[in-house]
Curated annotation (Swiss-Prot):
Gene: CYP2A11
Protein name: Cytochrome P450 2A11
Single GO term (MF): heme binding
The entry's keywords: Acetylation, Endoplasmic reticulum, Heme, Iron, Membrane, Metal-binding, Microsome, Monooxygenase, Oxidoreductase
Cellular component per GO, a single term: endoplasmic reticulum membrane
Keyword Iron part of the UniProt annotation: yes
Broad enzyme group: oxidoreductase
Amino acid sequence: MLASGLLLAALLACLTVMILLSVWRQRKLWGKLPPGPTPLPFIGNYLQLNTEQMYDSLMKIRDRYGPVFTIHLGPRRIVVLCGQEAVKEALVDQAEDFSGRGEQATFDWLFKGYGVAFSTWERARPLRRFAISTLRDFGVGKRGIEERIQEEAGFLIEAFRDTRGAFIDPTFFLSRTVSNVISSIVFGDRFDYEDKEFLSLLRMMLGSFQFTATPTGQLYEMFYSVMKHLPGPQQQAFKELEGLRDFIAKKVERNQRTLDPNSPRDFIDSFLIRMQEEKKDPKSEFHMKNLVLTTLNLFFAGTETVSTTMRYGFLLLMKHPDVEAKVHEEIDRVIGRNRQPKFEDRAKMPYTEAVIHEIQRFTDMIPMGLARRVTRDTKFRDFLLPKGTEVFPMLGSVLKDPKFFSKPREFYPQHFLDEKGQFKKSDAFMPFSVGKRYCLGEGLARMELFLFFTTIMQNFRFRSQQAPQDIDVSPKHVGFATIPRTYTMSFVPR
């Protein structure tokens, strides 16, 4: 009995020594990484993090260790960059070093390193170049896409008028409208607002996007190697992503059957033509998997981020009726009520422009940014980041950097106005990220936000069932994404 007890004690002692040696070796190997809390085997720094408030948890660690620190999400080792200076220094000044793509576990379950958004820089570079060029060919940045947005805005105005002032949830009104703009580019046509398949797709996008912001979604980011095999909300997110992929694949099959290489109808046609041109190149990135998943990247990003920003923006304007009134006054003075807004009106509407920028800043749609990865051993400040190190560029910490924004936690359009009331740019305005992997749809999103907001506000006043002081503008979830609370509102004709 005594011998077995001694043997057990010896085994436990050996195990403890092995764990301590493992941690010591890791710390030695990572000796030039930024400081951070000591991780435990497998669970990393889980005990120091609150998955319900992941962003705030990371900011508390920043307060202790500084703007550049190391954190372990389960077994994942990540360097976190906070504030405008650190993020710009990495993504702009050392853009090539930080151009790799880190993990986003929920989406990686489907994409597995393919498509333009979640792939390595080597794969993403030709796909980005092609996507930007093709979007331009189909009118992005030109008068053609502006007319398409104006047309879609007209459909939305009629849909709001049909509600006759009833209190409604604006979620799918907005996502249908925004999605139809990118759909006209990637699929060559818009959907009818009552199309059941279309509404199903929008629910799939919203569901999977919201999952990434939930506590379970944050837990999945840490322990996906185990959780992907277990029941739970992550399985529903996988089904939704699969459903979206299958829909895109059917669209591609349809285009293949009717393709005219001399007359591309949409993004899918253009990609198919490029595939034919490079079919003899074994290293070409223009193949079926990248076609389906790049199209899904464009469809998803072109729908969910802008529509969610607008939905959050409406809530903020109901909370701040004085801001809404000033926007109405500027619209009436510059545009009037008898014509649709144009993108060129933006130059004469500094207050409206400031409000839209402040909505984007305050809503902070992707607070932790899309994870990056250093492409080689990289010296950053006083640290050495080994090749392959994951990096979180905390865009939320840039958009709330007190060095640039006097009231970072408040909705305050004056952040973007000078003393003369003219629009003022900010070096810390990075909702689309920066560097080599900035959002390739930035130009389209800016045009959509301005034209949709001004057209809606030209025609309607917003009414809440709550008094302004009772409206809660804190987010429902903050994780990979920021998700506003569900609410109802009335669109009152002006």
